Curated annotation (Swiss-Prot):
Residues 135-166 are annotated as: Disordered. One of its GO terms (molecular function) is structural constituent of ribosome. HAMAP family: Ribosomal_uS9_B. InterPro entries: Ribosomal_Su5_D2-typ_SF, Ribosomal_uS9, Ribosomal_uS9_bac/plastid, Ribosomal_uS9_CS, Ribsml_uS5_D2-typ_fold_subgr. Residues 152-166 have a biased composition (Basic residues). Residues 142-151 have a biased composition (Basic and acidic residues). Belongs to the universal ribosomal protein uS9 family. This is Small ribosomal subunit protein uS9. One of its GO terms (cellular component) is cytoplasm. Keywords: Ribonucleoprotein, Ribosomal protein. It comes from Mycobacterium avium (strain 104). The gene is rpsI.
Amino acid sequence: MTETTEALENPDNPDAETAAAEVTEAPVEAVPAESYVFERPIQTVGRRKEAVVRVRLVPGTGKFNLNGRTLEGYFPNKVHQQLIKAPLVTVDRVDSFDIYAHLHGGGPSGQAGALRLGIARALILASPDDRPALKKAGFLTRDPRATERKKYGLKKARKAPQYSKR
C-alpha cells in the first residue's frame, strides 16, 4: 500500500510505478459469497432403516469427516457420494461447510440416506431460507421404509411354507 501512495506522490520515480503495478497484479483470494459464523456447531440427527447418523456442521471448506475418514474413504461408491452431497449441491453450499459425522448401525445405503437427511436438517438451521428448495427436492422427508418383521408360522416376513392339499 505504501508503494502505491509513493507512486501517486512522485510520478517521476519509475521504481515506484513498477512497485505499484506489482501490488495491483497480486492475486485476490476468492471470498465465499456468504460467510457463516455460529456460536457453536449445528448438530442434527438423521435416520434411515437401522442407521443413525449424528451430524455436526461447521463453517469451512467442504471437508467431510465420517468416523475419522474422508467421504471417499468411507463411501467408495460414487452413487452414495452423490446422494450425500445432493442437499449441499441443491442450495449451492458445497464449499461453505465442513461436516463431521458419527455413523452407526445399518449398511452403506442406510447410512448414506441417514447422512443426507442429517445434512439437510443442519442446512435449514444454518439458513432457514433454503427450506423450500430442500423440501421440494425431498431431502427433509424421513424415509419410513424399514424391514418388516418375521412372523411365527412363516419362513420370512410373508413367505409361507409350501401348502399341500393332500
